[in-house]
Amino acid sequence: MRKKLTELLVCPKCHEALDCQPELIADDGDIRTGSLRCAGCQVSYPIERGIPRFVPTGNYATSFGYQWNRFRQEQIDSLNGTRQSEERLRNETAWDSSWWNGKTVLDAGCGAGRFLEVSSRNRECDVVGVDLSSAIDAAQETVSGRSNVHLVQASIFELPFRPRSFDGVYCIGVIQHTPDPKAAGQSLADVVEDEGRIAVTIYERRWSTMLYSKYWVRPVTRRIKAEWLLNLIKTIMPVAFILSEVLFRIPVLKRIFQFILPVANYVDSKELSMRQRYQWAVLDTFDMLAPAYDNPQRYADVVEIMKERNIGEIQRLSNPGLNLVGTKISSSEVAL
């Protein structure tokens, strides 16, 4: 943990200042171990392996911790030879490359650092990655050595940051996996600076969404131990992958088969090799079936949440899912 991060942090419970008490400091000034003690409620939060930890181990995101420590490399552009994460981040934020200069940005639900690895390439931008699960340790390995990246293990519902700390916040594919998507969205909006930007991508709920086959089996699969579920998927995948290779390519009918087969196979991807598609099929099928929560949201509901938290200039981008971007209305304008 670097000193600059301490300037943003507050107690997630009472929002009072934190006193940093380092125990081991690396040669580059990185605080490897120590604690952060709240001046108000006197709670002490540990700093372990260079990461401040504001939540206990073991929570509703445990499957994601297992997932991203097991599949850390698969979706990292610099490791898989593609630009998929770079293009997705650019498309789903719609933030011009020059906008990032001099900004402080939050990656909410950073996982193994798929998008952190991209956003932190601009060394003039400080990026904070936060995740509830042990995936934060996988992210640390992904962005190792980048002094403009700061990592925090915390809950999206109790973000340990000062209000309006960030010039930009992006949260891609995370909110639907929380027990309370509305509260998660509100929490994110609260840490956006006046005239700052926010971008979210969420599973969209339509009349047919809950008929999708993964929702038929999730009541069972989400209760299976992560290791057992992954082994089950690996056992089934050789047959499921071949079957989906055929069915997902049939004109007109392929959408029906994608709807009724709970298998992730990106048959239309030009960048991924067959081997990579197979790895992603295992990863994303697990991602569909393992999470404790999967709560798609309606467009109108998400827009209402954003407006309640003074997000204006809301636009829906033409990307898969419910992808919304907006700008925080300044306090002076709200007062008027």
Predicted regions and their residues:
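Conserved N-terminal segment of class I S-adenosyl-L-methionine
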Residues: 2-160, 293-296, 301, 313-336
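Hydrophobic beta-strand segment of the Class I
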Residues: 169-170
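Short catalytic micro-motifs in class I SAM-dependent methyltransferases
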Residues: 173-174
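A short glycine-rich, Lys/Arg-flanked "PGG" loop and its adjoining helix->strand segment in the class I
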Residues: 182-194
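Short, glycine-/aromatic-enriched active-site segment of Class I SAM-dependent methyltransferases
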Residues: 203-220, 274-292
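Conserved class I S-adenosyl-L-methionine
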Residues: 197-231, 235-238
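SAM-dependent methyltransferase
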Residues: 227-291
